Amino acid sequence: MGLSSQNGQLRGPVKPSGGPGGGGTQTQQQMNQLKNTNTINNGTQQQAQSMTTTIKPGDDWKKTLKLPPKDLRIKTSDVTSTKGNEFEDYCLKRELLMGIFEMGWEKPSPIQEESIPIALTGRDILARAKNGTGKSGAYLIPLLERLDLKKDNIQAMVIVPTRELALQVSQICIQVSKHMGGAKVMATTGGTNLRDDIMRLDDTVHVVIATPGRILDLIKKGVAKVDHVQMIVLDEADKLLSQDFVQIMEDIILTLPKNRQILLYSATFPLSVQKFMNSHLQKPYEINLMEELTLKGVTQYYAYVTERQKVHCLNTLFPRLQTNQSIIFCNSSQRVELLAKKISQLGYSCFYIHAKMRQEHRNRVFHDFRNGLCRNLVCTDLFTRGIDIQAVNVVINFDFPKLAETYLHRIGRSGRFGHLGLAINLITYDDRFNLKSIEEQLGTEIKPIPSNIDKSLYVAEYHSEPVEDEKP
């Protein structure tokens, strides 16, 4: 069939998903816009360039903004159930506000309303909120507001569990701060040349966004000087404080000034997080926006299959679904590559990504999928933490997870920021007890898949109801 495999990208004769119309892919104009945005390579230091437009007191500065197209898709109460605050209410720098609005962030989400004013006071925060409800903005906005750009030292650190999430947060940070002339952001993660990072730290860096092992290595070598760090953020704190990372995080905290501010953000808070909080946070402000664990906009189904029927089931689903982009999860790296190959042989364009791939290949797949160059991505749980790709409206668990926490993070890749999404689970005989257990633990209902799935459940254009208005 003439398949080619290159760096996690499998290409065969491409069939459009979703039947007639191709399933609502991004327009060429949108793709070109995405391609033109800055790409943050691992360890790359970027300076937010100030714009040539001079903002004078009294100017109607909002008229100078280059706003993205307004997102008219329906949003659920996960992000619209707010107090009615505006970003201007927080007395933020005008240059920061410009970056916020040019990101398309019109009003603060519930987690942003709760977090931003408290974080600006310097108080520690323990925040629990659903995936895809604006946590990155909740900590990046106060972080950038509190920077003193006259100083040339590291003032804030954001620690994340995966390399891909570090690159994503770096991109957001740079875009939001682009009007703050001189704000310098550096991403540093494992899997890249340590010497390059050492050289970049010779220059001014204000914000470091890193994975735990790499930043601790740089601190121990005396290259990353953290004695002036005033804020550290642990994004996906439950993972960072799991057995894999907790000792590294303890070592990092010990290198920081005693009066630093600590912000913890996660969807789940196990005992390890509580223990860390008791040891290191000082009278933290606690935020809990998790009345229910799963996103309101994600509809969940299961299909009973045998192991041999799984690929056939996918082949049946693809033409019936109105897929914009989909993420398909497997439980091992080997199964990821095998499934990606089979999907390509069926005639569907497919990328794959897992932790055993070389970092530059992972970066390329992540970048290209995010930019809409492929509709389907097969991956391991590497892609469950914080990764935000707004175009994803379908998640398929080809292999059903054993843990409720893993399931929660997987299906949270769709339905981002209050939008609609669909999660389909292929359940074998051996999975049936896990299915029941996860339903009970999350307090959610996973329904049998119907013969025809109502497109209004996961495709915004088919939704008959008007977009929910924010509360006045």
UniProtKB/Swiss-Prot annotation:
Sumoylated. Residues 26-39 have a biased composition (Low complexity). Residues 297-457 form the Helicase C-terminal domain. Its main location: cytoplasm. GO terms for cellular component: cytoplasm; cytoplasmic ribonucleoprotein granule; nucleus; P-body. A motif (DEAD box) lies at residues 235-238. Residues 116-287 form the Helicase ATP-binding domain. It is found in: Cytoplasm, P-body; Cytoplasm; Nucleus; Cytoplasm, Cytoplasmic ribonucleoprotein granule. GO terms for biological process: miRNA-mediated gene silencing by inhibition of translation; negative regulation of translation; P-body assembly. InterPro entries: DEAD/DEAH_box_helicase_dom (IPR011545), Helicase_ATP-bd (IPR014001), Helicase_C-like (IPR001650), P-loop_NTPase (IPR027417), RNA-helicase_DEAD-box_CS (IPR000629), RNA_helicase_DEAD_Q_motif (IPR014014). Its EC number is 3.6.4.13. A motif (Q motif) lies at residues 85-113. Residues 1-39, 45-64 are annotated as: Disordered. Disulfide bonds: none annotated. It catalyses: ATP + H2O = ADP + phosphate + H(+). The modification Phosphothreonine is found at residue 25. ATP binds at residues 129-136. Essential for the formation of P-bodies, cytosolic membrane-less ribonucleoprotein granules involved in RNA metabolism through the coordinated storage of mRNAs encoding regulatory functions. Plays a role in P-bodies to coordinate the storage of translationally inactive mRNAs in the cytoplasm and prevent their degradation. In the process of mRNA degradation, plays a role in mRNA decapping. Blocks autophagy in nutrient-rich conditions by repressing the expression of ATG-related genes through degradation of their transcripts. Belongs to the DEAD box helicase family. DDX6/DHH1 subfamily. Interacts with LSM14A, LSM14B, EIF4ENIF1/4E-T, PATL1, EDC3 and EDC4. Forms a complex with DCP1A, DCP2, EDC3 and EDC4/HEDLS. Interacts with LIMD1, WTIP and AJUBA. Interacts with APOBEC3G in an RNA-dependent manner. Interacts with RC3H1. Interacts with ATXN2L. Interacts with MCRIP1. Interacts with MCRIP2. Interacts with NUFIP2. Interacts with TRIM71 (via NHL repeats) in an RNA-dependent manner. This is Probable ATP-dependent RNA helicase DDX6.
